[in-house]
């Protein structure tokens, strides 16, 4: 099993520290970098090609579609997990529709972040069960 490399992108030092403190204890997961902005995240992802990018939703500032596209172009194998405090579900659904592979709420980082990283790296999605029906509804509207 190879090491899962992770870059943490969060505008708050406390947010980056929370992710780092949980992940540094995990065998098989290595934090390769920390950044504070969307532009830094794109540059670091292009350079380091991490397997997982933890990306705080506030970094998008209304440009989530463009940033997700740019991230996929610069590092196509990097999988994005969004971090959010309290974000409207439609914004989360938009991000998932445009390439994010999951999301985790800040309050759940200490409990679920390592599992989310491992499962998304393995090709699965990480979303709370209550979002699954909404995702299916969104997919039904896209194909209708």
Where are these predicted regions, by residue range?
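Short amphipathic alpha-helix used as the core "switch/output" element in two-component signaling
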Residues: 65-77
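Short, conserved "switch-loop" micro-motifs in signal-transduction and mechanochemical regulators
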Residues: 86-87
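Conserved acidic segment of CheY-like receiver
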Residues: 2-15, 19-23, 53
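Conserved phosphotransfer microenvironments
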Residues: 38, 54-68
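Two-component signal transduction core modules
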Residues: 53, 80, 103-104
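Acidic, metal-coordinating helix/loop segments flanking the phosphotransfer/catalytic sites
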Residues: 36-52
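Short, flexible helix-to-coil linker/hinge segments that flank and couple to helix-turn-helix
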Residues: 91-97, 102, 107-144
């Amino acid at each position: 099993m190879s090491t899962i490399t992770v870059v943490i992108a969060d505008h708050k030092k406390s947010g980056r520290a929370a992710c780092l403190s949980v992940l540094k204890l995990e065998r098989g997961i290595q934090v390769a970098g920390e950044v504070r902005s969307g532009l830094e995240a794109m540059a670091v992802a292009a350079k380091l090609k991490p397997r997982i990018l933890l990306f705080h939703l506030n970094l998008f500032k209304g440009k989530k579609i463009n940033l997700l596209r740019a991230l996929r172009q610069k590092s196509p194998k990097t999988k994005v997990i969004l971090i959010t405090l309290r974000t409207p579900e439609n914004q989360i659904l938009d991000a998932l529709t445009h390439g994010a592979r999951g999301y985790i709420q800040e309050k759940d980082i200490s409990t679920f972040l390592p599992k989310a990283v491992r499962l998304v790296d393995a090709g699965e999605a990480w979303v709370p069960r209550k979002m699954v029906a909404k995702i299916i509804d969104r997919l039904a509207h896209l194909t209708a």
